[in-house]
Design a protein with these regions (language model features):
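Self-processing/autoproteolytic domain segments and adjacent N-terminal interaction modules in large
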Residues: 1-101, 243-261
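Compositionally biased Ser/Thr/Gly- and acidic/asparagine-rich
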Residues: 69-261
């Protein structure tokens, strides 16, 4: 069926990046809002990998966009509204992947994928699929929590903070900011329920095809974790496990979270 799916981000500022994916089969490049001035895809397969200009969106492949230095984003943090229109993806979705080697946790083995469906998918079911055995077990989600800064390490004058990748594996998720309530719902911590339109990194240790199918799709109300500042409680439901989180923070914005399980 034809759909119109609106994705609403948490409040964001100029220069922030958002990781997306198309829930429809058509190329939605022309639908990207004009204030998102930089648009890239990730090219794996070399030792370092590289960002390439985006020209076409494909189901299951992630892409990123940057917010331009324009109002209202350069005045006050504002949510992004991105409406994606087209034929909803359904059934099998295959993504060709190119790895650098069979074992290294390096940029060249990282692949940028996305949930190809207009509903959430379960990360564990995705990993368990017999055609996805070449994948590593950790997913990385960009939160864009730390402002771009000259104090962040990197090759440019102003750089982003790599610690802004929240992660999830079978033990659980680690966030990028300290929770301000007792539930932890606003800690930007992934739950393993990947929302529609969400792009993410995972490592691949062999060339081939990654497969998505309908067995991974979730039909209950868990399609909410697109890294807003306030999460729906249902999106944070996880199986009971024996584990605990250690938060390390200082009086500035610096924060690290460690999961032990």
């Amino acid at each position: 069926p034809n759909i119109e799916m609106e994705k609403i981000s948490r409040p964001m500022s100029d220069w922030d990046y958002v990781y997306w994916g198309a829930p429809v089969s058509e190329n939605i490049y022309s639908q990207i809002p004009g204030f998102l001035d930089k648009r890239y895809r990730w090219q794996s397969g070399t030792a370092t990998g590289s960002w390439q200009n985006l020209g076409t969106t494909l189901p299951g492949q992630g892409f990123i966009t940057r917010i331009a230095d324009v109002a209202p984003f350069n005045v006050t943090p504002t949510a992004i509204n991105f409406t994606m229109k087209g034929t909803a993806n359904n059934g099998y979705v295959y993504v060709n992947v190119d790895s650098y080697d069979s074992s290294s946790i390096i940029y060249g083995n990282a692949i940028l994928l996305s949930n190809p469906y207009p509903c959430a998918i379960d990360a564990a079911t995705f990993l368990d699929h017999p055609n996805n055995t070449e994948l590593g077990g950790t997913f990385s989600f960009w939160t864009s929590f730390t402002p771009i800064s000259t104090s962040n390490p990197g090759p440019d004058t102003y750089n982003y903070n790599e610690a802004d990748y929240a992660t999830w594996n079978r033990t659980g998720g680690t966030g990028t900011k300290a929770s301000t309530d007792t539930t932890g719902n606003d800690s930007l911590r992934p739950t393993g329920k990947i929302a529609s339109g969400q792009g993410f990194f995972v490592h691949a240790f062999a060339d081939g095809q990654i497969e998505f199918d309908n067995s991974m799709r979730l039909v209950s109300n868990v399609n909410t974790q697109f890294f807003r500042t306030s999460q729906n409680a249902l999106a944070n439901l996880e199986p009971e496990k024996h584990r605990f989180w250690l938060n390390f923070k200082d009086n500035s914005i610096a924060f690290r979270q460690m999961l032990v399980g």
